[in-house]
């Protein structure tokens, strides 16, 4: 591990320079990795491992709403009956079981997977949800297996895309149960094999608490909510849809957030007008102080398991997928995002095509 300074706090991280792909391949040479689920993360992680020379088997159902994922696996070169099986058949094989189904799917499939585990196997997660909220999920591994986690800091699409362009994506990793004594090596090897650039140590609990808070907060929920609030305010005061969208979303995604990505928030502020900078610095404090109680409430609901209860209740409902489709359709058909589609079509780079 190397020690790095994060805002004055020293943390130790794993680099792929010290823990190379070759080392990961050696450690995994006698392992057979079974990916249970070929969704967004399952596909990306499985393809990256296959490309890195790891033996991988896919478990994916092929009927109903599962069919597109099975068909995609076949398109990607997985062969039915050879390295592509149903979930139940795949679960019987391998030494490292990657549990990459949805959280609700993990609950449903766990009794089957648990009965296939052999002494010394490893159960691999990319989210601490099922383990930390075991009282609600029922996912309790036996004592004679390793329980490990690698959580990429991005979507499966980014995991695969970054792997293909050679950049990789950072991930956090954790060991919840080390029966064999080699769980640390296993989890690091898996992290590098799926294409991680750096591996950050964490715990299952810290991973799931921060992940659920982030998704409901700045990364998705708060981002969408505050965008809608500003857009609606501008529209209510007579601004056109294009103007409201440009000042709410387009300038952020096409300019400002790229400056933050390059060199930090202060860099972005330094590269804005004086008027923008003075106002933003003043209102930053008001937004921070105004939203902190909301974030505290959110974190409390995550920590107590209330958010988990809601997720499981909604995802198990028979009409869940239809309600989800309706909600996303409503969002996509809102004036704001229909205006956004037109604005995006007018970007110069698209006009050149």
What is each stretch, according to the model?
Residues 1-32, 175, 195-202:
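Glycine/serine-rich phosphate-binding loop and adjoining beta1-alpha1 elements at the start
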Residues 32, 54-58, 146:
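Residues at the starts of beta-strands that form the adenosine-phosphate
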Residues 44, 50-78:
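NAD(P)-binding Rossmann-fold cofactor-contacting core
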Residues 65, 73-132, 140-155:
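Rossmann-like NAD(P)-binding element
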Residues 124-216:
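Rossmann-fold dinucleotide-binding core
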Residues 181-236, 242-260:
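Active-site-proximal catalytic alpha-helix in oxidoreductases
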Residues 30-49:
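Glycine-rich adenosine-cofactor-binding loop
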Residues 2-6, 11-18, 236-353:
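NAD(P)-dependent Rossmann-like dehydrogenase/reductase catalytic/cofactor-binding core
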């Amino acid at each position: 591990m190397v020690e790095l300074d994060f805002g004055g706090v020293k943390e130790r991280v794993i680099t792929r320079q010290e823990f190379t792909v070759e080392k990961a391949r050696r450690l995994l040479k006698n392992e057979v990795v079974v990916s249970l689920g070929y969704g967004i993360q399952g596909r990306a992680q499985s393809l990256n491992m296959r490309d890195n020379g790891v033996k991988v088997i896919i478990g994916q159902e092929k009927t109903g709403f599962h069919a597109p994922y099975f068909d995609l696996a076949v398109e990607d070169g997985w062969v039915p009956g050879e390295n592509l099986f149903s979930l139940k058949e795949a679960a019987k094989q391998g030494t490292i079981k990657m549990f990459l189904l949805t959280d609700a799917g993990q609950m449903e499939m766990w009794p089957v997977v648990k009965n296939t585990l052999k002494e010394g196997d490893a159960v691999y997660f990319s989210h601490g949800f099922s383990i930390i909220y075991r009282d609600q999920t029922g996912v309790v591994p036996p004592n004679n297996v390793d329980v490990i986690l690698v959580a990429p800091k991005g979507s499966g699409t980014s995991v695969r895309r970054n792997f293909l362009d050679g950049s990789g994506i950072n991930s956090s990793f954790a060991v919840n149960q080390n029966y064999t004594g080699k769980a640390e090596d296993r989890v690091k090897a898996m992290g590098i094999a799926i294409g991680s650039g750096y591996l950050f140590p964490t715990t299952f609990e810290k991973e799931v608490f921060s992940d659920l808070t982030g998704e409901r907060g700045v990364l998705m929920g708060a981002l969408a909510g505050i965008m809608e609030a500003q857009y609606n305010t501008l529209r209510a005061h007579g601004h056109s849809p294009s103007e409201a969208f440009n000042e709410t979303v387009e300038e952020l995604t096409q300019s400002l957030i790229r400056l933050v990505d390059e060199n930090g928030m202060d860099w972005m502020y330094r590269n804005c007008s004086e008027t923008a900078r003075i106002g933003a610095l003043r209102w930053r404090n008001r937004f921070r102080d105004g939203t902190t109680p909301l974030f505290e409430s959110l974190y409390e609901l995550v920590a107590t398991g209330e958010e988990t209860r809601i997720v499981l209740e909604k995802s198990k409902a028979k009409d869940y997928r239809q309600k989800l489709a309706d909600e996303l359709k409503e969002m996509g058909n809102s004036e704001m995002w229909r205006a956004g589609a037109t604005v995006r079509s007018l970007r110069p780079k698209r006009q050149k095509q």
